[in-house]
């Protein structure tokens, strides 16, 4: 097998592994809903790292070709939340000014 054929094969294998990880995350979102509000549309769901030390964003791990077991381990550190709830959680954790104003407005 030539060098170019070997490169193509490795590239195809890496892309197949990425696709398996993408499929795993898609199925995960399809079977989970937002921890805070119950939203279940997979298009608006994301991961919020709340336990342990964050290794990396899960999408970055998939892009970089990390294995499915690494990605599963990272997902275990997360809650599934919708983008709105993730934004609210992030603002609250950081003590952001926008969060304090919004909290007063909601009361």
What function would you assign to each model-found segment?
Residues 1-107:
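Contiguous alpha-helical segments
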């Amino acid at each position: 097998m030539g060098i170019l054929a070997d490169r193509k094969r490795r590239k195809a294998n890496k892309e197949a592994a990425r696709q398996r990880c993408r499929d795993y995350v898609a199925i995960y979102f399809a079977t989970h809903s937002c921890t805070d509000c119950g939203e279940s549309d997979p298009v608006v769901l994301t991961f919020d790292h709340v336990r342990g030390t964050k290794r990396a964003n899960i999408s970055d791990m998939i892009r970089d070709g990390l294995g499915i077991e690494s990605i599963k381990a990272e997902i275990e550190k997360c809650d599934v939340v919708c983008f709105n709830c993730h934004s609210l959680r992030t603002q609250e954790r950081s003590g952001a000014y926008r969060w304090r104003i919004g909290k007063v407005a909601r009361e």
